[in-house]
Amino acid sequence: MSFLDTLFGKRERSSDIARDRLLTVLVHDRVKLTPDMMEQLKADLSAVIARYVPSVDAGAIEVTLLRGESVDHLKADIPLRRTTQKY
């Protein structure tokens, strides 16, 4: 079966996708962050970071909650635009 998996690629099962979605909902519930609060947090982070780092692509910032073994994590992916250095 592994030969077929490598040949055609193994797709993620719907049960795994459903489990991940449920974990996301549970983490959001435990931390008490609503989707509106997450969007406000993303907007606030974008504004503050753009003030100090002009090469931030504010529209591409992603904020997610991750469930850890003993601690939940707030993860922010902040892509930076590449700029040329002038010396």
Curated annotation (Swiss-Prot):
Gene3D superfamilies: Cell division topological specificity factor MinE. Keywords: Cell cycle, Cell division. InterPro entries: MinE, MinE_sf. GO terms for biological process: cell division; regulation of division septum assembly. It comes from the Bacteria. Belongs to the MinE family. This is Cell division topological specificity factor. It comes from Roseiflexus sp. (strain RS-1). The gene is minE.
